[in-house]
Amino acid sequence: MASLITTHRVKASIFASCLAIGLLLTLFVSSASSWRQAITPAGLRLEQATQAIVVSEPLHCPKNKTQPTVNPGGSHLAYVTWLSGTVDQTDDLENDKYFVATRILLWHLLHNPSTRTQGIDVVVMVDPSVSEARRARLVRDGAILHAVEFLTSSVALHPEQERWKNIMTKLRVFQMTQYSRILMLDGDTMLLHPLDGVFDDPGAQIQHTQDHEPTTLAALPPTYLLAGISEPADSHHSFPVTKAEIKDPGYLNAGFFMLAPSEAAFEHYRSYLQVPGTFRSTYMEQDLLNQAHRWDGPMPWKELDYKWNVRYPTENDFEKGLVSMHEKWWEQKYIYDNQKVKDWLQSRRWEMKGWYDAYDRMNCDA
């Protein structure tokens, strides 16, 4: 594959630098020939799927933003993902799988022409455990960085995995009241198509809290928004996933959900961390949100269209119009068969790297 960077309206010096980027990309794509020839589940060859790394338009250094973007209708919308310290806290960022996954998500949302947003802010919420090197890399990648303090609990919590010990901090997204609505995404999310349309989903609208009995917890907010999807048991499912295929009906997966920030909602959630026995904590913030927004309670969560996201994606999902998936690029325990999907997931890691290698050549800090 060759990459040719042309423009008729830029100065010769800019043309020269873009040409250098193109040469770098040519070398990268040549080295990727071992996976480039595979057929993707969407019926495209990977050389077509990797078109984002063939720079057909000028790359621009990111500008640090201090104010939220005003979206159509005067609203302030955002994509937010949360990053905490992983097991590996060295500055070998290329081998930190969860950090790499976050960078892939940013690349999908900000830079890939086939998946990027049209003007919605992309924010990474970081807690104190995230190193300065990681923070600097995320800003260079184009993310808005939002630093928060840990959210602690006065009751004992029993997460299934040790690496989830700080994950209650993720609930601080509800304090980001500079935005009217937020799509919260786990870092191991990948996109096939743009996600902007999810903000128009019927389920993604603010609701009124229903009448309810007095509670020992903090007061419920008068309005709220929590909308998302449940997950299938594995990759043996239809597209879209049917109710009969859902592993735990009525149980929201907190890796992909829409919310309306609210200090009142945040204080209500935080009160669960101060009263023993109010929720199970195996899946931490996911269990807390499901208890607060249970379907038989005063703030039931709403379902989004299942085309927007799925766990354990399949070739059929790709072909039928799946928009995004919640799946690790390096490990897919519950995707059975569907080797093309697994190949596609792994290829995103290297496509992202090729794009950013060219991006870094621009010397944005100079």
Where in this protein do the model-derived segments appear?
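Glycosyltransferase catalytic domains, chiefly GT-A lineage
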Residues: 2-366
